[in-house]
Amino acid sequence: MAQAGSENKEPWNEETRAKFEGKSRSEYLDPCQEAAQRSIRCLHRNQGDRTMCSDYFEAYRECKKQWIERRREQKRKAGALF
């Protein structure tokens, strides 16, 4: 099975928060983009065989999950309704 790498960089940290809050509304920011790119590269290396890349997909899902949870937490702390 493919190795997803040993990096466990927090997707929602102060640096990411500052970038996210400082961007324009039309600009897209995904702190999990690196994990997404690894998944795509794995698919290319393995001729589209998703079973060979399951670790990469799981790392991406976990990154997104952490990011969304941290965003919700930040909004709750800030008292935002949405």
UniProtKB/Swiss-Prot annotation:
A motif (Cx9C motif 1) lies at residues 32-42. The keyword Disulfide bond applies. One of its GO terms (cellular component) is mitochondrion. It is found in: Mitochondrion intermembrane space. Its main location: mitochondrion. The keyword Transit peptide applies. It comes from the Eukaryota. Residues 7-27 have a biased composition (Basic and acidic residues). A motif (Cx9C motif 2) lies at residues 53-63. InterPro entries: COX23 (IPR051040), Cys_alpha_HP_mot_SF (IPR009069). Residues 1-27 are annotated as: Disordered. Keywords: Disulfide bond, Mitochondrion, Transit peptide. GO terms for biological process: mitochondrial respiratory chain complex assembly. Residues 29-71 form the CHCH domain. PANTHER family: COILED-COIL-HELIX-COILED-COIL-HELIX DOMAIN-CONTAINING PROTEIN 7 (PTHR46811:SF1). Belongs to the COX23 family. This is Cytochrome c oxidase-assembly factor cox-23, mitochondrial. It comes from Neurospora crassa (strain ATCC 24698 / 74-OR23-1A / CBS 708.71 / DSM 1257 / FGSC 987).
